[in-house]
Amino acid sequence: MQATSCASLEAYDSERPRVDRDQAVKPMPSLSIRRITGREELSLFSRLPYVLDEELADDLVQGRRRPEWMWVAVLGDRLLARAAWWGRQGDATPVVLDVLDVDDSLPAPDRIDIGVRLLRTAMAATLPNGSPPPEYSRLIPPDWRDGTTSRRIVEDRMVILERTGARLFVERLRLEWRPGTPIPEPSGRLTFRPPHNHPEMAALMTRALDGTLDAHSRHSLTRMSADAVATRHYEDELARYPSPKEWWRVAMLPDAEPVGFVIPAHNGYNAIIAYIAVLPEHRGKRYVDDILAEGTRVLARQNIPRVRASTDLGNVPMAHAFERAGYIDFGREINMTWT
């Protein structure tokens, strides 16, 4: 726990009651930066609105969040800023910083300063020494650049992160298919089956990394082999989804040669297209349309309310494939990283 004095309280002068000289003047509270005490402080933590607020209570129950990963900056009983990390069940350390908010009614210098101090304090107390902080993720509207308020909210948080050493890594499209949207009928060009085993899936994932346009994969390939990247992706993410692996599909030509694969899944929040790829030697033939339709079809049979997916804003071929399949661009995601 850390308590510091607010660097500038001019913003609160208008809120101070005027008193006679003979009256006792109560001392102004200092800015307190601390972890939340537990679920009983969720109402405090949620005073600054964000799209993930409705998931916080269940995340705490499921172990995807912990009180020691959730931080607030308060002045008296007023919440001025907050930050929280998310982690996979059973992990000792978080994997993403996905909540960072400030009171947007504060003057710009104050809200930036308070956000920076909160984040630096929380990072020092929460994250392991000597390792880069986990990636930052912010879910934002698709037209966030077009509105003065929405742009300021996003850019303020980016400034806070930049002052702690983070840099913009990638902007991603958030996509959604909704029941009732037509799914293309099978073209007959490909057949589909579940993968035989983990080694087959790992081998296909390794091959698919050749020529990838995905920013995260390309960055990982600068630090490790394609086989290691595929193995880590499989073990750290894909294998942990609670949905059955029987949903996964390998796409094949009539002679049984694999051309790609799709991993329909449920991540505990939504049905998703977790991974889709066409092998390098088969790209350029729009096999991705057949593969994406099959993945969507698998999930649609589960009577789900929606299917979510995402791809890098710069991955134009994949974005067009989702558009052809009836997925709408309903949001964006900003990822920032520390090096």
Regions found by a protein language model. Give the residues of each.
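Hydrophobic adenine-recognition pocket in adenosine-nucleotide-binding enzymes
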Residues: I276-V278, T311
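A structural microfeature
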Residues: A81, V170-E171, G260, G331
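Active-site rim helix/loop that mediates acceptor-substrate recognition in acyltransferases
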Residues: S46-G76, A84, H219-L253
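Conserved donor-binding loop and adjoining core beta-sheet/short helix segment
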Residues: D59-D143, P254, V262-A271, L279
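Conserved active-site tyrosine of GNAT-family acetyltransferases
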Residues: R157, L161, F322-E323, Y327
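Acyl-donor-binding surface of acyltransferase catalytic domains
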Residues: M1-A24, R111-H196, M336
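Conserved acetyl-CoA-binding loop-helix of GNAT-fold acetyltransferases
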Residues: A108-L127, V278, G284-R301, A319-R324
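Short amphipathic alpha-helix that is part of the acyltransferase structural core
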Residues: C6-D58, P186-A228
